[in-house]
Amino acid sequence: MPKLIDHDRRREEIAEATWRVIHAEGISGVSIRTVAAEAGISTGSIRHVFPSKTELLVHATELVGQRAWVRIQRHLAEPEPRALVLSVVEELLPLDAERRLEMEVTVALIAEAPGNARVREVLDESYEVVREVCRRLVTRLRRAGLTAPGVDVESATTVLHGLVDGLAIHLLINPDPDFRRQALRMIEASIDGLRS
């Protein structure tokens, strides 16, 4: 009897192998061959799922967003708005090995994007999703009375989004636990600053 393959799981395993190759060798090390070797499967098996390197990179990019969304959803039932905002923002920062790897992959793919329109398209979509998450967080704070009455939601969204993106890069460069604590305090100060 032929072996049944869970195609969604196989796609995820291949994307994870792509992440590991990017982590070890950078984006230039990614090929159907290197990813197949990392995943422990044949190049034919990879080509069956991802006919090109671009499709492989696109799925690797999409998986980063999917994983972040799953983590974010765990916090959406948090009744206290400030705690909700802080917990969601933390999910967007490279504060552990899993999120650090995802951020390394994202940065590598950002560098690849100017020469790859399809990767650029997926990254643009991811950018808009994160911006919308930030907008909803600011709106939630405003509705809960945790911002000044006249706060400009769009401006506050831009500030929060920029702070998250900037701190993500800084945390990637400097994973020191003291800096992690400082970064989280900066997020808290920014959120609390919306009250004035």
Predicted regions and their residues:
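Generic hydrophobic, amphipathic alpha-helix propensity
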Residues: 7-18, 35, 60-64, 68, ...
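Helix-turn-helix
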Residues: 13, 17-59
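Residue cluster at the C-terminal edge of the helix-turn-helix DNA-binding motif
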Residues: 21-24, 38, 49, 67, ...
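Short loop-to-helix capping motifs
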Residues: 26, 112-117
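A ubiquitous short alpha-helical element
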Residues: 55-56, 88-95, 121-128
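Hydrophobic alpha-helical connector segments
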Residues: 59-62, 70-103, 153-160
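Amphipathic alpha-helical packing segments from all-alpha helical-bundle domains
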Residues: 74, 98-107, 117-143, 155, ...
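Hydrophobic/aromatic-rich alpha-helical bundle segments in the mid-to-C-terminal region
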Residues: 83, 118-124, 142-194
